[in-house]
């Protein structure tokens, strides 16, 4: 911990939500630092070891049923260890994170109390980054359907080509013996919005996208933004809060 020596408390009323958030981070990185502050609530930012993808989590104070924090503080956590504990959390469990300078105590309540304690890692203080990319096209869609798209194509190739022209979004994969494509029209019921200042096309790693669909279970909608041969931005809104969400950035790879 870097900051106040007082205990910091975060209370989540829905166990499934906090479990999926932890899994979304652990899918990208083993260790990460998050910040808790009276102004911003909970903020996490971490770059994967290959520096190909970044994950960010934003949970404003209003997201929590209870939050106690005196001043901005940073905490380093081993998410691989934390996710093992969170796998025991049921959907209707109430989960508390109690943080000191040395430890994270996870309290799970549902008829009785379960307590687990993790030692903290040295934190690495950060400033929230946003990529300096002019995203020219995007689609906002039912988040539950994005995993269907990825799973449909993952057996075809190790890369996926995404293109958006404002009227349709196409997801394609091909190998020497097979080519598959999924087309989502602007008028399809899964689409909430689609736009393009100019058409965009880029290729991304399938393995990374597979790991980036974990928040779909706790999000009503996901927004994909892109530009030709530029990184992809995915944002999952969480809990009906405008500022709450899980965000990924994924670097593009060479063309197919």
Language-model regions: role of each:
Residues 1-26, 31-155, 163-256:
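DNA polymerase sliding clamps and clamp-related checkpoint/processivity subunits
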Residues 160:
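Polyanion-binding surfaces on beta-sheet-dominated domains and ring/shell assemblies
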